[in-house]
Amino acid sequence: MPFEQTQLFCDEKQTILKKIDTRNEIPDTIKSIPIPKISEAGFHYEPKNVNICLPKINIPNEILMKHEVEKYRKLFQSKPQTARKSVSVRTVSCAKGCAQRCESERAEDEAGKMCAKILNFTCSKCQDRTQYSPNDLQKHFEMWHHGELPSFPCEMCSFSASDFQIFKQHRKTHRNTFVKCDICNSERSYTLLDLTKHFTSKHCVNGNFQCEECRFFTQDVGTFVQHIHRHKEVHYKCGKCHHLCFTKGELQKHLRVHSGTLPFTCHYCSYGAIHKDQLVRHVITLHKEHLYAKEKLERDQYDKRVAKTTTGLKLILKRYKIGPTKTFWKRKTIASGNDESIGKNAQAFNIVSKTQTKSEDQSQEQLNEEKGGRQHCEDGDKPIESGSEKATVLSTGQCNKADEGASAPSSVLSAVQGPTVLLVRNNKITIPANYSAKFMGFKMVDGRQHIVIKLLPANKQILPSPALQPNTEKESTANLPPQAMDNTGFATGLTAMNDTDFVKAAPLSCSSPELPRKVISEKETAFISEKNNMLQMVDDSKSVTSLPTPSESVTSVRLTTKVEARDNVDLWENPSTQSHPDLIGTSINSPDKVNLTIRPNAYSCGDMHNYCINYVNSELPAESSNCFEFSNQGSLPFHNYSKVNNKRRRFSRGAVCENLQRESSNKTVTQQSTSDSDTTSPLRKESSNSDSLLASISPLSGTLKIKTEIEEPCDLEETQNFNEQSLFTNENQNLLNMTEEPKWDDIPCAGSPMMPRITSVFSLQSEQASEFLPPEVNQLLQDTLKPRSDIKEDSNNIPSKNLPLDCDQTLKKSKEEVIKSSKDFQMQDIISVPSASVGVNVPANDLNLKCNGQEKQALSVLQDVRDPGVTTKIPSIITLLKTQSDAIITQQLVKDKLRTTTQHSGPVYVQNPLLTSEQKNPVFVQTPKGFIIPLHVANKPGLHVFSGRPVPLVNTQSVPAALLVNKKPGVVLTVNNGKPEGVPTVKTENVHSYGTVTKEPCRTPFLKAEHNRYCLTPGLCSSIGSCVNMKTCSENTLPLKGSYIIKTSVSSSVKAVPFANVLPEQQGPNVNVLDAVKQQNESLPKASLYTLMPDGKQAVFFKCMMPNNTKLLKPRLVQNSTYQRIQPKRPAGAPQKILLKIFNPVLSMSAVNNLSVGNSASSFQKEIVPSKPTVHGEQKVPQSSRDALPVSVQDLMPANEAVLSSTAACPGSSEEPVHISERSETRVSRSKANCTIERNFNKRKTCKNKFAKIKTRISQDSETAFVSRNRSCKRKYIDNYQEPPRKKSATHRKCKERANAEDVQETFGFSRPRLPKDSGRTLRLFPFNSEQLVKCPRRNQPVVVLNHPDADAPEVERVMKTITKFNGRVLKVSLSKATINALLKPVSITSETTYSDFSKRHKMLKPVNSVKERFVLKLTLKKTSKNNYQIVKTTSEDVLKSKFNCWFCGRVFDNQDVWAGHGQRHLVEATKDWNMLE
């Protein structure tokens, strides 16, 4: 007795059917029974009557409850991967092939002892080399070798045991035996126990073992290992693309992709397809009107032949009691028709239902046959040669002859040549004279054993088609529920089999309305159930689907199976498409009328039913007919519709409708028909010679196959499987007209613009960082680009003539407004953005809809414009875009429909760029308060920063500040009152853009340029601390009030990571972001510390980075009659480097006095120049753009200390020019006074590493005392200063390094006392990892401070050590009181008490007691036993995983649940003090 139901028609070793003439071997108990000779090619039958004796199989009669049925079902179907012993047909050639395979496997057994393998055993009695699991072998012996014990031999030695537990104990003695992992393919050997741990830790993701070569996954390590060995078997490899196929049929199907020809063409248009099912979908979707006309003609012909048929279709309704009050109806499957279907898992199992009572033996036992000529997934390598093979569907039952005769004229009959009754009695099957039988095996249905026998006709006979009565159309239409008629859109007889002859599929407009889930009303069902409470045949006079009036009854009316469309929320973008669907899914209306009673309440209880539908004789356009077969087992509840998994699919513009996936009905419906040997339909003759369309839904995988079969045998293998499972909603759910009412309920709303977008956290996107930005910003960031845009089409978008939009009209519209785009909103219009690399790309909006809890992503497909008229306009369009005025560009920014939040409500003036004589150089102009900087490149590759009150406000427009947002991808910095709110970096594919800044600066100079000279002049922005290398290019720039110029080397080498975004036409300066990983090892304060702000405001993630300079360049002073400038030596052709950075001014003060700890070989040269009325007295020249960061604010801009120290208290500062010469003498005197203290301090070495050698040169114009003091201090610098700390000791020494840096700074007297915690600061913002997608949080998003410079307490350092130890697994840290007190304790130490209190202060910072923290770790646990768990590590790095990026901190997650929870914690922190945020 087989104990587990296997995939009988998919298992390679069990059901491979060879085409050659062989004698079927039935093993064991039925070997002595004569077996008919079957030739599948000719089907010549030799014996007339064959009796097949089958062993009696007893199944308990008590299996009536659902849980018992499920228990037996699981018993028989627990492991489909393992071959089972069953009474099945085995060809000799198959046995030989298996023997050869086993020989090759035996040759590998020597090496197999050193590799992982699952415990499989063969039967020592049968000796047929069939592999069994230990439980299966035990069951096999109990069934076939009763009274004997199985043998479990050890593969590592000669030990053998009859009990598996003893065998397991023996295997423990081989624990030291080393084996290898087949997945890793490494030379490392494991013990058996270690190998199990290795599989669990390395190759298990969330408790699932997933195959890297296919989509198979399981939770059982043994099944997983066995599956891996399957990939090592003989494969069929494509010679062109090295694609591997497991069967020859799959290979032949794959080879058609490389043929380049379109063997299937549409009869109504020029459409061509590679596969037949694609052509079927095309015809159904676009040429319904032709099918309607053809249907009308065929219907008239059928009505004339109705009276000639004498046989009818019978239904056997079986009533089961599951529970006290629930009544289920099971429809026995009867199939008939032209069967040449091929494909994976596309089978119709015919089941013999064995009844328990003698009265039911004759009437209820039925044989459901496999259709003749069906090939299975393993046998797909050879086609069926016979194009007209017919499978016979036989029904048994005791029929009321009188009722049958009375109802014969009014019944729909399906005449089938062959036996009318197939009796199964006493385990003997009587085969008719004109049929041969093939035993296929057993099948478990509802806990009962069913015999599957395939009947093959002896000769090629044409089966007649059914005939219909003229009055059935009206009756069947009248019996339709009102819902069904309203939603289906057919005038008469929507689902009547006599009315429709072709496949009706969804037109895919808007959404998919659902077909009626039942054909009869509740009253009718109740009426039928009362009259059929006993298991009996339903008379034709009392039809299931007809009203309870015997005179008006029709035996088989119509079939409306609710087959929902795969894309049930997709929209047509083609306006010419039919706006309302006439029929959704795949509603097959065949001439054979079928009585269908579907009780959804029965399915809601999960009862397993077997329904099979075989549709015949539905003709499709141009002499082609359809044969639809629907079969399934194990129905699913109707209300599980929300669990439909929508998968991503790509569609090309030319053949979108080809790949539309249709979900099959998960219910199988029965059509029982009795054959009539006297009548023959001409339609059947036509269908045997013409092309036919076959759509079959597999019972095992629920896949839909639509095939067009022609006479070429090779074309029979082109069935395309869509592994989608159709789940059905509840019966009570109303059928909505989704045409007018699209499903936008599941689409997340945009959220309030005044708050951070919470909905973005839970977007199921992992494509790019731009997806985490709000749609308004994302559209703005991409509007001004000219990239290679991909056309994003909706998955059911059918190509239309209007798809390549008129680019001229679109561009004219784009000048005036920016079309708002949103993935999370509804579909907008299509805008076209020309690119220099491609002709014209029309980016449709990336529609992102949530379909029943699952978000569906429309994949972008590159679209080539085929319209020559549009292509010729491309150069002029590009020129137009490049030459359009900056006023129009500004209008696009202003007129955009954005509702962004800014903290200042006053008007902000947008200054347009100035046209300069030198077009290739960027312009930097002073930016006073109230001006925004539109860094736009228009017809010039330079970067333009325009602002300043002295500029004539001719093109300046005053707009609300809430409407302004930066429009370019790259670094977007929003500065409100001197505080950076967020700097997100958008990464797009193959697109480069320029980093831009949008700010409302303070009154201090932001960027200053000079007149009449071309020099590299990086200015210092006191409000945000950005150091930018820039180049003045105009002699007519704004008048300057005086500026300090820090000369930097253009040719200095800076290790930097360029922006991912750069405009294609940009050829000017390159924006570079320093490598975070590199600087993390070279930064002064590098630990990520966690601080708490007492004022309740949000903290910020900061990386205090110190740049590294590699080349020294001496300054060149140029005297001028008016003022003094510095010009660098610029090599010919050297590109300009522009470095946009945010830094901590307090940190920079200590860094400049420490002379850049992060620079291993840096040397600063101070040039003290005599003060002049218009010239600043002190010039400081770092050697590269990175050296401009640590410039002390007091050295350059002492008047702006208030702004730098606390921007919250002083949002604006003086507009007067900075004169450092006024403070130079004071600074010299302070250096004299503190030089002795510095010497004494240098004697106390706090770190072991040496600082870099620093050369300090003082100009001759400075005082000699200051020079001598500095020279004497230089030796102490060399001895005392460290090199950048190493990676291992970086965290340990951070506190000491900062203590040194701050004390040296305070010793010289350059620094002020530390500011209290509650004062706001402008700190440096830098990502953790330069490779992460989200560099910085989006604007208006809360940030968390980790390494605040004032929070270097050892308590926090201990926390960070723990975080580093767990390598990113820490989700939450609960700080103890000691740590919180250390963070909140204000430090205010003056320069007078620095030295005296240094040792005491340093000791105070050391922890007295151990700090206890609580860490919530992210660990994936796998349950090993009842209460034991073990940590499951991630899979190998080469396995492709889904990534989920946190839009707050940029952290990357591979688990969606963990990512969502992580975002929730950010949101809780963001909204904790919501009323306090301003």
Curated annotation (Swiss-Prot):
It comes from the Eukaryota. Keywords: Chromatin regulator, DNA-binding, Isopeptide bond, Metal-binding, Nucleus, Phosphoprotein, Repeat, Transcription, Transcription regulation, Ubl conjugation, Zinc, Zinc-finger. InterPro entries: Znf_C2H2_sf, Znf_C2H2_type. A zinc finger (C2H2-type) spans 152-174, 209-231, 236-258, 264-287, 1444-1466. One of its GO terms (cellular component) is nucleus. Coiled coil: none annotated. PROSITE patterns: ZINC_FINGER_C2H2_1, ZINC_FINGER_C2H2_2. GO terms for biological process: chromatin organization; regulation of transcription by RNA polymerase II. Residues 355-394, 464-484, 656-694 are annotated as: Disordered. It is found in: Nucleus. The modification Phosphoserine is found at residue 652. There is a cross-link at residues 358, 390, 428, 518, 707, 792, 882, 895, 987, 1008, 1041, 1055, 1078, 1180, 1441 (Glycyl lysine isopeptide (Lys-Gly) (interchain with G-Cter in SUMO2)). GO terms for molecular function: DNA binding; DNA-binding transcription factor activity, RNA polymerase II-specific; zinc ion binding. Residues 670-681 have a biased composition (Low complexity). SUPFAM superfamilies: beta-beta-alpha zinc fingers. Belongs to the krueppel C2H2-type zinc-finger protein family. Through its association with the EHMT1-EHMT2/G9A and PRC2/EED-EZH2 histone methyltransferase complexes may function in gene silencing, regulating repressive post-translational methylation of histone tails at promoters of target genes. This is Zinc finger protein 518A. It comes from Rattus norvegicus. The gene is Znf518a.
